[in-house]
Amino acid sequence: MDTLKRFYGLSLLFTVVCLGLGLWYGMSSTGTVAGTAKILWIIVVLSVLEISLSFDNAVVNASVLKDMDRAWQKRFLTWGILFAVFGMRIVFPLAIVAIAAGIGPLETVNLSLRDPAEYERLVSGAHVGIAGFGGAFLAMVGLKFFFDSDKDVHWIDSIERFLSGISALPAAEIALLLLAMWGISLLLPEPDALTFLIAGILGLVTFIAVEGVSTLLELQEEKQRLAGAAVRSGLGGFLYLNILDASFSFDGVIGAFALSNNMIVIALGLSIGAMFVRSMTIHLVEKGTLAQYRYLEHGAFWAIIVLGGIMLLSARFHISETITGLIGAVLIGLSLWWSVRFNRRHPRMVDAEAQGD
């Protein structure tokens, strides 16, 4: 109970608030108990789907967050949720519609409330560009983990050793991604192919820019550390995590239209899920779960590569979000089981690593 209160208390409170808002909105918009119950049910289902399909997001977040100080960890949970809720679940789809329809923000809000079907059509119509941008960014996040010459722990041994080995080639992962994007673009009609490639390149550039900012901030922190000054900055990691969360959210926001085309209902449901993902991240960091299970990170990053690949392919093929989530869950489950098996077979090595940390 203490663990639940400590790590998930804020998320549970946030859930109560969102359900309260859903209750109020349901009664005011439908005027019936049945209509309100339907809205609340959709909110709950959306939140559960968001949580169940985002465990890989939480694991990857934890791998970054564990190196940030406590203050920035808290900011990720508080400030970051504002970006996740208002930025990705509300402003992002509204911005897509505003750009696609050439209308202003207020007109877009009115459209989402008065003509949800047209609002859904406009958001879904932007899927090719979203798939290119989000897929490229996520693919780079996953590839960067494995294209690392200093990586000495391997889960899928032969593949990971090979990727670690060829990382000596400059920008090998970028070349691989560009080739994949070019191949997928050949399957698309010409206008969509151009949109897809431009969006994918922008996703790649965004990843490089965020990595660059993080590196510059780390160098500045190192200078301060050498000078004996206190180092408290976690801005680079904070920016990286929020862009990563945005990339994870693209498919979820669009896929939510399968259950509802009401902007308010979608925002409430996905926001609850986003809050719990952040709480799961903090829980993983505080409990040191990544250190206890040596292959868990590997499973999460493989899941991200798969998610990025599926997102890129979704520009041409419809792939259910359920399938995507199941693949991620299977990879993480296998990596967890492999980690437990390793710990049982090599207890002395595990103890030595724990003492070394």
Name each model-derived stretch.
Residues M1-D357:
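Multi-pass alpha-helical transmembrane bundle typical of ion/small-solute transporters
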